[in-house]
Amino acid sequence: MMMKISFNTCFQILLGFIVFIASITLLGRIFSRPSKTKDRCRQLPPGRPGWPILGNLPELIMTRPRSKYFHLAMKELKTDIACFNFAGTHTITINSDEIAREAFRERDADLADRPQLSIVESIGDNYKTMGTSSYGEHFMKMKKVITTEIMSVKTLNMLEAARTIEADNLIAYIHSMYQRSETVDVRELSRVYGYAVTMRMLFGRRHVTKENMFSDDGRLGKAEKHHLEVIFNTLNCLPGFSPVDYVDRWLGGWNIDGEEERAKVNVNLVRSYNNPIIDERVEIWREKGGKAAVEDWLDTFITLKDQNGNYLVTPDEIKAQCVEFCIAAIDNPANNMEWTLGEMLKNPEILRKALKELDEVVGKDRLVQESDIRNLNYLKACCRETFRIHPSAHYVPPHVARQDTTLGGYFIPKGSHIHVCRPGLGRNPKIWKDPLAYEPERHLQGDGITKEVTLVETEMRFVSFSTGRRGCVGVKVGTIMMAMMLARFLQGFNWKLHRDFGPLSLEEDDASLLMAKPLLLSVEPRLASNLYPKFRP
């Protein structure tokens, strides 16, 4: 039976443990000090001094948000790579584009593992997904399935009609809000769009219950709202640097801070919506002869077979991977959309340039389509600049060293956790001139001339989508979702601050990196009334 203890109780236990071992501090340091010769050959990156055994863990526990601990420490150490010791686990943080490139190019194979964390275990259902599994045969299988089948050009082209339905529904929803004189919460609306597109591609429908409980104007039904809520609740458990992950071998079963339990509860709620759909579809395909054609990602997963005619992906693996898709697909486009529109309203000249490009490339006689995206370079430059300054998370998903290696000339022991800091790259004055200024034009210049803009940043000067062996496989669909949402927002409507929002400050929440106050806007149509589509369920 799992024991639950409060944060204060846990902290008292840890402090007691610290007092108990403090008496051996001097002795431990004497006997653990390596020779100077060995130090020069195996020097760790700079770091803060720590307690015996627990290392820097007490400092981490006492700092909230925990991501702030690393930012402050690296600033204090004046370094672009640092090492922290959490109860014997070396945690390496990186703020340098040069070292990040080394990590995901030259040392990619050495750093291709994932940490075994309690929260990640819950999401991956014991590490069954591509994103959570250790580097090995199972990871290779899931990655091959997703890259060659799920995210293939053929499959994404098949799903274009489904994505277009939700792009049209987005316009219909905003237009209905205008007709009712409603305030637009950009964050909420962006998440609804990301959710609806993901559900269409994954399950072939935006609703998760047979009751089909949603309105006829684009709003989510009660079940869908709850599904989306628990997806984000699960996502919010991920950035934690939870102490339980570093001391689980000592305190296994104790629910420190409640984070592990919160993650499990929310993951199970996500599954409670996903699994009935998956079970029903597995039965149709594998027991009742199937459907006339493969129509979505779920159909693709279920019908894949190996060279011997055996089903390639088990139902449990499908269920786990669907949870991972739900968690991975929605927040990045939604966060990018809110910050981009906020920056455009703060900088009207940038908004004017984006609208000018849309009017020249697409015009005002039809709605922008996916085929237009390749020609909307300024719009994509705005998305890139938002990724640079306003990332959706503090760190790239952690990598683990599979063997002893080096980074930046420092020794990295096997088992080290590697964290590349997104704000540390995108806002780094060593990489970017005037890094806090929002300037999309900086992404348009290639050898002095304008080039086609993509959202991928291969040089690791900022992170849009992670790269390397463990990199994001959804770059193409992520780009489509992001660019289409922004293009439809801008082409279809004129936006201005709602009177209740107050002055536009664009302040950032330290913990989540979201805009501190949700962006509330008023909206007016900018196209002919006949171009606004009706909602399609």
From Swiss-Prot:
GO terms, biological process: glucosinolate biosynthetic process
Main EC class the enzyme belongs to: oxidoreductase
Catalytic activity annotation: L-hexahomomethionine + 2 reduced [NADPH--hemoprotein reductase] + 2 O2 = (E)-9-(methylsulfanyl)nonanal oxime + 2 oxidized [NADPH--hemoprotein reductase] + CO2 + 3 H2O + 2 H(+); L-pentahomomethionine + 2 reduced [NADPH--hemoprotein reductase] + 2 O2 = (E)-8-(methylsulfanyl)octanal oxime + 2 oxidized [NADPH--hemoprotein reductase] + CO2 + 3 H2O + 2 H(+); an L-polyhomomethionine + 2 reduced [NADPH--hemoprotein reductase] + 2 O2 = an (E)-omega-(methylsulfanyl)-alkanal oxime + 2 oxidized [NADPH--hemoprotein reductase] + CO2 + 3 H2O + 2 H(+)
Keywords from the named record: Endoplasmic reticulum, Heme, Iron, Membrane, Metal-binding, Monooxygenase, Oxidoreductase, Transmembrane, Transmembrane helix
Presence of the UniProt keyword Endoplasmic reticulum in the record: yes
PROSITE patterns the UniProt entry points to: CYTOCHROME_P450 (PS00086)
Membrane-topology descriptor: Single-pass membrane protein
Family of this protein: Belongs to the cytochrome P450 family.
Name the record gives this protein: Hexahomomethionine N-hydroxylase
